Design a protein with these regions (language model features):
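Short, flexible segments with low predicted structural confidence
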Residues: 25, 97-98, 125-127
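Second-shell loop/turn segments in exported
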Residues: 42-43, 109-117, 136-145
Length: 175
């Protein structure tokens, strides 16, 4: 084998580990998927308008969870009256996606998934915000039909994560 070719191969194989170093983190970031879950309405008063949650998937780490702002206690005294008056406390819960989907399947309610087109930094910001919001001191909120509910909370967290990343929420009228 030619001496120059040997030196060239030695250089290439010496540099190769440096070039591939760090690609594990890149592939993990690329494999993260964050989606909005839109759930069909149910027949109970608390499910008449459907539901929205956020799904976070990171297969490389075995993560497939749902951030669900629609949890409440059936044991709340006068629940239906308090719900109708907008005086019900709801909270953020985190659960495995399979369990979340199984509940909707059991009740014959569809779930649609819309994957969000987020950069790695926007994803990181959103997960950080959701985890901060899931702390015991932050998870409970006063439900409001129009301004503070399971649909507005995910929207607000996505918008906040975009702002923290220096981006903004854009809507397209294209059909």
């Amino acid at each position: 084998m030619n001496s120059k070719l040997r030196h060239l191969l030695l250089i290439v194989f010496s540099i190769f580990p440096i070039l591939t170093w760090g690609t594990e983190n890149l592939s993990t970031a690329d494999s993260i998927r964050i989606s909005l879950l839109t759930c069909a309405p149910g027949e109970e008063i608390y499910s008449l308008f459907g539901h929205t949650a956020i799904r976070y998937e990171e297969p490389a780490r075995g993560i497939d969870r749902v951030y669900n702002y629609g949890l409440f206690s059936f044991n709340t005294p006068n629940f239906i009256l308090r719900f109708a008056l907008g005086k019900t406390d709801y909270q953020l819960g985190v659960e495995d996606y399979r369990r979340f989907a199984a509940e909707y399947e059991y009740f014959g309610r569809s779930v649609w998934q819309q994957t969000l087109n987020l950069t790695a930094e926007e994803q990181r910001q959103l997960i950080t915000l959701l985890e901060k919001n899931y702390r015991p001191e932050n998870r409970i909120y006063r439900y409001n039909f129009f301004y503070d509910n399971c649909a507005t909370r995910p929207r607000d967290k996505v918008e906040e994560s975009l702002q923290k990343s220096g981006s903004q929420l854009l809507f397209s009228n294209a059909h």
